A protein has these predicted regions:
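Active-site nucleotide/adenylate-binding loops and adjacent lid/helix of ATP-dependent enzymes
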Residues: 10-12, 16, 21-28, 41-44, ...
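Short hydrophobic beta-strand segments
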Residues: 45-53, 59-72, 132-133
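Conserved N-proximal alpha/beta basic substrate-recognition cap immediately N-terminal to
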Residues: 70-197
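A short acidic-Thr-Gly-centered motif at the start of a beta-strand
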Residues: 209-221, 347-348, 401-415
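Phosphate-binding site of ATP-dependent enzymes
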Residues: 224, 235-320
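A short glycine-rich, hydrophobically flanked beta-strand micro-motif that places a catalytic Asp/Glu
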Residues: 266-267, 275-277, 334-347
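C-terminal active-site "lid" helix and adjoining low-complexity regulatory extension at the edge
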Residues: 311-319, 330-334, 343-397
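Pepsin/retropepsin-fold aspartyl endopeptidases
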Residues: 393-538
Length: 538
């Protein structure tokens, strides 16, 4: 696996830098942490909490699709889901598939998913009334990943999408992502067998964790304990706290057993005996803190995982903890995640602050948090998913010119060449047409060799220098760009001009609804190039 962080979930690193005030000149791309910048430079994010006192829960989804490894009654998440359904005003149809036994296929309008016990065919147009749960433990199954990808690409809401989940469950990649976003965390480094047996590399890596580490006299490294983690561990497994004097012996033993193992080594921070788990829902235009709990360590174990027996209790977050949780969740591109924060002993690490992020969880458990808040957590979360326009599609980069399909009335489809707006000046999408006529009630025109007529909509006022003029508008039922569709798109209609390369302009609002960002200098990233528009056909 490449050691570099994968930024494929962002359309550019520049957006990440701008959002989190990162000065890239101060960093190369280290294999571990450098001295962190002052954390959380950006303006404060609005803090919104889920309402835990509502009496009736609202569900807008007709179908819930669950991908799991286990249908049995022992599956606590499934148990929570079954219990949650009883409390909703609209009961969804539940479709459960075991990942190891399933497959999926699609045709022009439908996706079919099946396993040994169930088969379900869903229309692609049902993307806004279907909720998909894809737990982390099942995404490693090839057929499950294929099904999740099909649903993601068609705009279904998936908790959680594949690529952000993969980054979150790789402790090194997520640590690099936190560093890029100025999220406070323990100093860290990546350690491989090659690093360990190369003296210079080993020293360089450990120095990233403790810059003043004494390699000549280990006895002088008092209070320089290390936390060693395997990259794909979860639930507290694969985590070790070691005395600095035992570093060499422990690493030697690990690499003797598994020479290919990659480890992340972190500085042991001075915490207060537990950590805080914050569940966050990140939508297109808002974030919601769903619930939070503090997990107390038990029996001298430095870990605080509920699955290992730690005690969980309610907690009121500090303003700093709220901001850290929200920014970490936003950075991850996960619609639903749990951020684990460790409060530090006051003043124990002045370069970081009073809290550090330990990790982010793309598939958090729901049982422990349900007991703490005395509500079924699934109810609380789904109740907040009440506006399809807020569903956070995974960003994908489109070219500044793409071939699109416009669906007009009576199921008339026309392929057209569109320019995708890279600025913010356009107030409406526009369509250039031929043989334009306006009788006051209807407008008619010819496009793509087809004669069409529309009920006239409210005109749009456009500006050209100091002049203002009206443009009639129409609403088309649907447009398709790449693999994504958006319904009810308003276009301002204008007469076609000669030698025009494109005859459609999609504005920023439409692109936002599609979930695309635009590459300013590359065309046809999503679709094959069409021939230049033949104006004579208009």
């Amino acid at each position: 696996m490449n050691n570099e962080i994968d930024y494929s979930i962002y359309e550019s690193v520049d957006d990440l830098k701008a959002a989190f005030s990162i000065n890239e000149d101060k960093r190369d791309e280290p294999k571990g942490s450098e001295k962190p910048d002052k954390v959380l430079k950006a303006d404060k994010l609005p803090v919104v909490y889920a309402d835990l006192n509502i009496k009736k829960y609202h569900n807008i989804f007709k179908h819930w699709i669950i991908f799991t490894n286990d249908r049995s009654d022992e599956n606590k998440t499934l148990k929570n889901i079954h219990e949650a359904i009883k409390d909703f005003d609209m009961k969804p149809e539940l479709h459960i598939f075991v990942a190891a036994d399933m497959d999926a296929e699609e045709d022009e309008s439908r996706i079919t998913i099946r396993d040994d016990e169930e088969e379900f065919t869903i229309e692609k147009e049902s993307n806004l009334d279907t909720l998909v749960f894809a737990r982390l433990g099942v995404q490693g199954e090839d057929e499950c990943e294929h099904a999740v990808q099909l649903l993601q690409d068609r705009g279904f809401l998936v908790l959680n999408p594949i690529r952000p989940s993969q980054i979150a469950c790789d402790k090194y990649q997520s640590a690099c992502l936190f560093e890029k976003g100025n999220i406070p965390q323990p100093r860290f480094c990546l350690m491989t067998k090659e690093d360990f047996y190369d003296a210079d590399s080993f020293k360089a890596q450990i120095t990233r964790v403790y810059p003043d580490y004494n390699f000549n006299d280990p006895d002088k490294n008092k209070d320089k304990d290390l936390v060693i983690k395997i990259l794909d561990g979860h639930g507290g497994t694969g985590v070790m706290l070691i005395d600095c004097k035992r570093t060499t012996a422990v690493l030697q033993a690990i690499f003797a057993i598994d020479p290919e193992r990659r480890l992340i080594i972190q500085r042991k921070e001075e915490g207060d005996g537990g950590d805080i788990r914050v569940h966050v829902l990140t939508l297109r235009n808002k974030q919601i803190i769903l619930a939070a709990m503090k997990r107390q360590q038990l029996g001298g174990d430095f870990r605080s995982n509920v699955s290992l027996g730690a005690e969980a209790v309610p907690i009121k977050l500090t303003p700093e903890q709220e901001q850290i949780a929200l920014r970490t969740a936003m950075l991850s591109k996960l619609p639903w995640c749990a951020v684990d924060i460790m409060p530090l002993v006051k003043g124990s690490n002045k370069e970081i602050g009073d809290n550090v992020v330990l990790e982010i969880n793309a598939s958090p458990g729901t049982f422990g948090i349900s007991e703490v808040i005395k509500r079924n957590f699934i109810n609380v979360m789904v109740n907040e998913l009440n506006d399809p326009s807020e569903f956070m599609l995974q960003d994908k980069t489109a070219g500044f010119v793409e071939s699109i399909n416009i669906k007009f009335a009576d199921n008339v489809h026309v392929d057209m060449l569109a320019k995708l707006d890279t600025g913010n000046s356009t107030t409406a999408s526009t369509m250039e047409v031929g043989k334009f006529a306006d009788n006051g009630k209807e407008i008619s025109f010819k496009v793509g060799g087809k004669n069409l007529s529309f009920k006239k909509q409210k005109s749009m006022i456009a500006k050209a220098g100091e002049e203002q003029y009206e443009r009639p508008t129409i609403i088309v039922p649907e447009i398709t760009v790449g693999l994504r569709k958006v319904k009810d798109v308003r276009f301002a209609v204008v007469k076609s001009r000669e030698n025009k390369t494109t005859n459609v302009l999609l504005n920023r609002d439409v692109l936002s609804r599609l979930g695309y960002t635009v590459h300013p200098s590359t065309a046809h990233i999503l679709t094959p190039e069409m021939q230049k528009i033949d104006v004579s056909r208009l």
